[in-house]
Amino acid sequence: MDPRDVIIKPWITEQSTDQMEENKYTFVVAKDANKTQIKDAVQKLFGVKVKQVNTMNMKGKPKRLGIYQGKTPSWKKAIITLTDDSKAIDLFE
């Protein structure tokens, strides 16, 4: 897979911003991507050294608008831990 197909977008929340101090960055990734593909994609796109990749599948939430019901799509989140000697990812600064 192309690295741009693996990493969809950064996930910026209050909790993920706090984790950046510990060299941990959060991304929304492709649902069919595995940890090895995610690690390679981050290293190629941002030029950093990855120590660890944690992934989790996020279930879509039910939504309702008047009489219409539906749900948000399910997605996959990855928390990337960088090595201590690696530089920070510029995208988050």
From Swiss-Prot:
Keywords on record: Ribonucleoprotein, Ribosomal protein, RNA-binding, rRNA-binding
Functional note: One of the early assembly proteins it binds 23S rRNA. One of the proteins that surrounds the polypeptide exit tunnel on the outside of the ribosome. Forms the main docking site for trigger factor binding to the ribosome.
A biological process from GO: translation
Protein name: Large ribosomal subunit protein uL23
Assembly behavior: Part of the 50S ribosomal subunit. Contacts protein L29, and trigger factor when it is bound to the ribosome.
Organism encoding this protein: Natranaerobius thermophilus (strain ATCC BAA-1301 / DSM 18059 / JW/NM-WN-LF)
Any one GO cellular component localisation term in the record: ribosome
Molecular functions per Gene Ontology: rRNA binding; structural constituent of ribosome
Gene3D superfamilies according to UniProt: 3.30.70.330
